[in-house]
């Protein structure tokens, strides 16, 4: 394959031969897709062949770099954190990462969350935030205003990645998870400097960690050993600690930070209205397994932001959980949500005036 001018037959032949693409080759394919040059057949063949071979960190880096380059911009926001899950665990839990993001922001860390509506559950992060009263359809300037006024903002994926529409038909018609399902956590247009990322697919979790390491980010990538795309409270989790361009895999047991195991059923959610009521209850201090899960994942975010250390992970998460619990119990988390709702609605009004 010629590095300067790859072609679809060359790219697809390489994947069928189970050869990893270079970052540049993967980037070429993604640019073809997101510019509308690729046909539905080419997109479907690429996604399926890549999935069958197994995605590499270099390939996913190429794909995600093109998405970020073509994304609608967000004004620079400095050091920031994202807490996000890949979805796809089919467990239909409440929106743990979204609640965790609010709690983390209430401790004083700037949070820039990136998300979408539900794909495989009844309620995605965008659905929950909308039910809570947050204006989700803001442009980059609106997101930045929310961060300035409330310390947290939300980038709604369809607003910032409109070129993904070119892959929509192929993704829908092949009907199986592909690399596109894992690009969301890697393509936050606000470009946070730290991430806590839950990945349900055991094959993709270390790949996601590898992509973040290649970017020089600080991150915790994790998968519950029960299959959840969260740091789970039902059993142990596997964690990939990302710092200084490297990845180290460690095991994490929630009992080490004082959490007694719960059943997955205790975390189950429903539609956006139900999950919004749960979120307000947790942010107002309600105790139980959902609070434990929210504290644990918010603490993972703070640990990633503060630079994670594999040999001190339990101590770091334990200390961060104390900060997160205080943010809830002092009322700061509930107050932050109210401030975010107000800031987002005001920003929506500014957007409307500009248009």
Curated annotation (Swiss-Prot):
Task: Tell me its EC number(s), please.
Answer: 2.4.2.18
Per UniProt, the cofactor note for this protein states: Binds 2 magnesium ions per monomer.
What pathway is this protein a component of?
A: Amino-acid biosynthesis; L-tryptophan biosynthesis; L-tryptophan from chorismate: step 2/5
Q: Name one GO cellular component term.
A: cytosol
* Top EC class for this record: transferase
* Residues that hold Mg(2+) 2 according to the record: 229-230
Keyword Glycosyltransferase present in the record's keywords: the answer is yes
Please describe the quaternary structure of this protein. Answer: Homodimer.
Family recorded in the similarity comment = Belongs to the anthranilate phosphoribosyltransferase family.
Q: What is this protein called?
A: Anthranilate phosphoribosyltransferase
